[in-house]
Amino acid sequence: MEKQSGALTASGTMAVCVKMGIPVAITCGMGGIGDIKGEELCPDLPALQQIPVVLISAGPKDMLDRKATIDWLISHGVKVIGTERNYCTGYVFCGEKVELQGKAENSTETVKPPMLIINEIPEERRIEDREILREAIAEGKRAEKEGRYFHPAANGKIDDCTDGYSSLIQLRGLIANMKVAETL
């Protein structure tokens, strides 16, 4: 039996949620706009616009253009807000500050699709060495050239370089997003 990825994208999770009548989907990292083969515009973005489910995420992955991703969502009618603040700075690494449309309110009246709620991994828990990100992007590009998927290769490199810490903070981020969903 050949090994295959069992990952489910944010858009896939949203599609399952709408079929099951679940109004809020959670993920940790999400896709966006970037130079990843076949994901120049990740399907997560049109899904946020078209699928009637609110998504809670720790934000677009660090190898993507976060500002272009947020701008695309806003320009296509998706409300993008943060849980703790009205901007985001990255996913598992810290980057440039990108303005959002506000902060989440604990009211079901204000939480409705199309909406992305960004609940970032706390900055003090993120990976500080951005050289690891550069190495991960290079590994992902190498995988693309070999006909493999970018994200598993890049994520694996980050995990290897951090002795599993990357996976740990992403798991904690996913759990934190579940807790946010419980308050809605």
In which residue ranges do the predicted regions lie?
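Short, ordered loop/turn segments at secondary-structure junctions
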Residues: 29-32, 58-61, 78, 83-88, ...
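Short, well-ordered, mixed-charge alpha-helical segments that flank or form enzyme active sites
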Residues: 19, 26-27, 32-37, 62-65, ...
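A C-terminal functional module that forms or caps the active site or interfaces directly
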Residues: 111-175
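Ligand-binding beta-strand-loop-alpha-helix segment within the catalytic cores
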Residues: 1-23
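Short, solvent-exposed amphipathic alpha-helical segments in soluble enzyme
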Residues: 68-75, 92, 96-99, 131-138
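Anionic-ligand binding region
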Residues: 90-110
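Short coil/turn connectors at secondary-structure junctions
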Residues: 19-23, 29, 48-53, 75-78, ...
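Active-site glycine-rich loop that binds ribose-phosphate moieties when present
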Residues: 7-10, 36-49, 54-74, 103-106
